[in-house]
C-alpha cells in the first residue's frame, strides 16, 4: 500500500485580481506617481502550474539530495564504529561528498530512469487559468508589488518611489559601513565555528537585499506612507546561538514559573484558571519595536539574570553576542546600526525569537513585586488584577517606569473587561473567549484548485475547524464566529461546513523511527505517479535478502511531497527584476584572446562566467562527432585553458570524459577538431536556499538533451556541487 506523507505548511488565503485606487491620492514630494492598491482575492500562497522544465529541475534536485543522504546512512551501516561519540553539529549537515557505496548502484540507475521517464498531461481549471493570466499581467508590469504589513493588501509602487521609501527607512536607523566590517564579522564567525569544529559545515552569511512592507493600517497612511524595514540577512552563527538560548529559556521558564506563553492555547489555559473573573480587570501592554529596542546592555543584564538558574559559559555568551552582529544590505552595500556598536537583534534572524523570550523572562522578573497576575508572549503582555482603578493607574505608571529604565517604550491600557490578545478575544464579565479578527482583514485560504499536494487541500478545512474550535469557549461562540471563515472557505472552493469540536488534547504516541525521506515536488500536470514508482523501486532494489534491507525498506524510507514555488515567490522575483533594472547595465563579457574575437573559442564571449557550455569533437576524416556538456562558475576562458592543458598533458587524460576521448583519438592518430558553444547560464551555489542553479541546469541538459552530451555519464546526476565549498567559513582567508 502506497504510504505517502505530505508535510507542508499551508499559510492560507483565495483568488480574484482587482485593482483599487485608494480613496485619497497618494503623493510623495519627489514624484507625481501614486500607489495603486491591489487586493488579491486569493492567497499569495496559492501555487501555479509550473513548466515541465522547472518541475523536472526540482525533481533532479530532490533525487540528488535523497541519494546523498542514503549514501551516508548506508556507509555508516556497512562500516560501523563501536563507541563512536556523536559530534555536536548544531543542526549543520556535512558538506563532504558522500562516500561511494556500490550496493546503491542499481537504485541510482533506476532513479535516473524515473526522472527521464516522467510524463506530463494538460491540467487546467478556471482558477489556474486566472492565476496564469495574473502572472502574465505581473510580468508586463513596470511597477513593484509591495505587501502590506498586517493586511492582505498589496500596492503597486513605482520603482523610484520604492527606492526612496526604502532609503528613508534604512537611513533612519542605519549608517553605511564598508567591506572591512563584513570581513571582521566573518573572521569572528570563522573563529567561533573553528572552535566548535563546524567551520567545514557552516556557510558565510549570504548578503540578502533588505525590503519594506507598508503599514496601511496606520492613520493617515495615504500621506505619510509608514513602512516596516525587514532585514533578511541572517548570520549562520545564529543557528548555534538559537540552540544555546533554547536550553537557557527552557530552564529559566521552568524554574521561575513565570507566565511566558508559547501560543494562544497557553493563554486560554491561563484565562480558564482565573478565579472570580468578574472581580478582575485587564492590564494589557505592547512593547514597541521590541526586537530592535533590545540593546547589548539589556541582553547582558538578561544573561546575568539567567545565570542564577543555569550555567552559561563565556564561550556561549560570546556566541550569543556574535549572532547579534548583524548587517543590513542594500544593493550589496553594507549598513550597520547607528551608534558605536554593531549590535542588532534583527527580526527574523535564527535566534531572534529565543532572544526575545529570554529578555521577556528578565522583564517579567522585574514586574513580580507588583502582585499582578501578568504574562507575556514575545512583545505582547497581558495581566489581571482586582485592585481599584486608582491603584491600577499607579501600577500602570510603575510598569512604564520599569520598561523605560531599560530603554523600552510601551503602550498600555488598563481597567478593561474585554481585550483582544493575539487571535482571541477574552471577556472577564462573561468568562467567555472567542476568535478575534483584525479590522478589515478578511480571512483568505489556499484555493481548492491550487497546485498543492492533495493531502494539504483535503485537510485544510479540518485544520481550520480544529483551530476555530480550540479558540472558542463553546459551540454558541463558535457558531457566532464562523460566518466569515465559512464564507472564505466557500470562496476558495471548499464545500465543508464548519462544526464545533470539543478540544481533545490527547496526543497519539508514535513510535520513533530513523526515516530517510524522499521529497519530490508535486504538480497536478504530472501524470506519472512518482511516489508509487519510487516505492516500487525501493522494493525491487532492496528485497529481504539484500544487505541493506534492514535500513532501506518501506518502514525506513518514505515519500513526502513538497510544494513548487508559490504566487508570493512570483511577486518577489518580479520585484527583484524591476529593482535590478535601476542598476547600471551589465557590460558585455568581452574577449581577451590575442587574435581577437575571430579566433575566440566562444565567438568573442570567452570572459563570460557562470555558464553551461558544449564541446563538439569532430573527426575530420569521417565527420563523426561526439559531444560533451560542461559548466564553469568562473570565466569560460579559464575553463577552456584547463581543457587545453588536459589535451596536451598526459596527466590530464582522466580529468574529464572529454579529455579521455581526445587522448584516445590522439593515440589512434585520428585527426580531430574541437568547437565550443554556450548553452545556458545560471547562478552558482546560494547558501540561503542551498541550491546551485548552474549545476542543476547542466544535469538537466545532460539528461534531456543526450545528443549534446554523448561523452557524459549517467553518474553525473549525483555529482556534488563544487561551488558550495567556496562559501564555507573554512575557506575564508584570514
Residue ranges and their predicted role:
Residues 1-216, 502, 506-534:
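Non-catalytic, polymerase-adjacent accessory regions of viral genome-replication enzymes
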Residues 28, 32, 274-398, 402, ...:
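Conserved polymerase palm-domain catalytic core
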Residues 135-139, 149-150, 157-160, 195-225, ...:
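Reverse-transcriptase-like RNA-dependent polymerase core
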Residues 207-256, 288-293, 338-368:
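Conserved pre-motif C helix in the palm subdomain of viral-like polymerases
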Residues 213, 244, 286, 348, ...:
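GIY-YIG nuclease signature motif recognition
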Residues 218-220, 263-282, 366, 613-622:
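A short acidic-Thr-Gly-centered motif at the start of a beta-strand
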Residues 314, 375-376, 383-462, 478-479, ...:
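Polymerase palm active-site segment centered on the conserved acidic dipeptide of motif C
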Residues 421, 634-686:
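Conserved short loop/helix modules at catalytic or binding sites
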